[in-house]
């Protein structure tokens, strides 16, 4: 896949786009997600977004999430408030018709700086794009290991390939078959990101 945006810095497995949205669109997203009536859901397992155990464990990855689209189907009335971003993705050759999952995630400040459990967002070949809504810390870690090489679970000690330090209005793009981890912000009060998964 070729990305043609002039602000896109390309490495072998990882790409980042600075200043992805204009200021007006940035403010629109912040106003949406920080509005007191926006429906965030609590999860005790922020990696998957679903926790059937409902027991708080010492290693629980607690956060908030909102799913806009899943398995290619719109599942939130707020999708209309965010779909304008798809025009910007098409400018870098990520096509809206290939979007299979769209989810916002929110982590609050936590002293634990360790990366969360390595995971992939989908089992099929896909490209993952993570957009940072606010200025925050809490690195995104991408590993060498892929779902193809470890189809059921990431190795216990995966090999770190790239570490992306988040910043407001930046976009991280990578092959979604690579295991990756989010992490809590330890300095800023919250980390707000939107994850897009595009089928390859």
Q: What feature does the model see in each segment?
A:
Residues 2-96:
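Non-heme Fe(II)/2-oxoglutarate
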Residues 75-200:
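Catalytic core of non-heme Fe(II) oxygenases with the double-stranded beta-helix
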Residues 1-2, 151:
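Short hydrophobic/aromatic-rich motifs at helix boundaries and adjacent loops
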């Amino acid at each position: 896949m070729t990305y043609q945006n002039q602000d896109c810095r390309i490495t072998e497995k990882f790409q980042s786009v600075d200043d992805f949205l204009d200021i007006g669109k940035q403010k629109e997203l912040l106003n949406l997600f920080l509005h007191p009536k926006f429906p965030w859901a609590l999860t005790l397992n922020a990696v998957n977004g679903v926790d059937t155990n409902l027991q708080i464990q010492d290693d629980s990855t607690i956060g908030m999430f909102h799913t806009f689209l899943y398995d290619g189907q719109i599942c939130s009335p707020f999708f209309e408030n965010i779909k304008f971003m798809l025009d910007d993705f098409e400018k870098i050759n990520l096509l809206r018709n290939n979007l299979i999952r769209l989810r916002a995630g929110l982590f609050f400040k936590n002293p634990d700086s360790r990366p969360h459990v390595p995971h992939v967002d989908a089992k099929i070949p896909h490209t993952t794009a993570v957009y940072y809504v606010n200025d925050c810390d809490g690195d995104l870690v991408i590993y060498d290991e892929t779902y193809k090489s470890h189809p059921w679970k990431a190795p216990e000690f995966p090999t770190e390939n790239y570490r992306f330090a988040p910043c407001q209005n930046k976009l991280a793009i990578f092959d979604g078959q690579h295991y990756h981890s989010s992490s809590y912000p330890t300095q800023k009060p919250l980390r707000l990101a939107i994850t897009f998964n595009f089928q390859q």
